[in-house]
Amino acid sequence: MQGTLSVWLAKRGLVHRSLGFDYQGIETLQIKPEDWHSIAVILYVYGYNYLRSQCAYDVAPGGLLASVYHLTRIEYGVNQAEEVCIKVFTHRSNSRIPSVFWVWKSADFQERESYDMLGITYDSHPRLKRILMPESWIGWPLRKDYIAPNFYEIQDAY
């Protein structure tokens, strides 16, 4: 089953894949990295002018990384807001996704945090640098295959 936004995008020939609905009935769409910036601009013009949040996660060790965007369209008042979740998957070996900073300014620190923790490079982001970890930090701490430097696990401490 496709949601209204998925049907609207399909009518206009915009490539995407519906991943279904979450427990709140919000549709989740998958967009390819190379299509993401143009579809983001189209969604903004269509009325999704509020980026509620952006996050990223490691799908599986050695697998894909995902950048997730929660967008809201407030056309008929806050009580009737439309929401959509967009997922953009990228390979960890070349984790590059177009930045949507120039579409939604609120993506600034959120994309920087995703870069800092997972190493996803957001192309055309004006200030893409570490935001939580020191600049000298090596690696991406939230990747499932990350090994912390000088970290020793103590077994049976008691």
UniProtKB/Swiss-Prot annotation:
Keyword field: Chloroplast, Membrane, NAD, NADP, Plastid, Plastoquinone, Quinone, Thylakoid, Translocase, Transport
Superkingdom of source: Eukaryota
Membrane topology term: Peripheral membrane protein
GO biological process: photosynthesis, light reaction
Localization (cell): Plastid, Chloroplast thylakoid membrane
CC annotations in GO: chloroplast thylakoid membrane
Chief place of localization: plastid
Keyword Heme recorded: no
Catalytic activity: a plastoquinone + NADH + (n+1) H(+)(in) = a plastoquinol + NAD(+) + n H(+)(out); a plastoquinone + NADPH + (n+1) H(+)(in) = a plastoquinol + NADP(+) + n H(+)(out)
EC code(s) of this entry: 7.1.1.-
Cross-referenced SUPFAM superfamilies: Nqo5-like
Alphabetized InterPro entries for the sequence: NADH_DH_suC, NADH_quin_OxRdtase_su_C/D-like, NADH_UbQ_OxRdtase_30kDa_su, NADH_UbQ_OxRdtase_CS
Assembly behavior: NDH is composed of at least 16 different subunits, 5 of which are encoded in the nucleus.
Protein family per UniProt: Belongs to the complex I 30 kDa subunit family.
PANTHER family in alphabetical order: NADH DEHYDROGENASE [UBIQUINONE] IRON-SULFUR PROTEIN 3, MITOCHONDRIAL (PTHR10884:SF14), NADH DEHYDROGENASE UBIQUINONE IRON-SULFUR PROTEIN 3 (PTHR10884)
Role noted for this protein: NDH shuttles electrons from NAD(P)H:plastoquinone, via FMN and iron-sulfur (Fe-S) centers, to quinones in the photosynthetic chain and possibly in a chloroplast respiratory chain. The immediate electron acceptor for the enzyme in this species is believed to be plastoquinone. Couples the redox reaction to proton translocation, and thus conserves the redox energy in a proton gradient.
Name of this protein: NAD(P)H-quinone oxidoreductase subunit J, chloroplastic
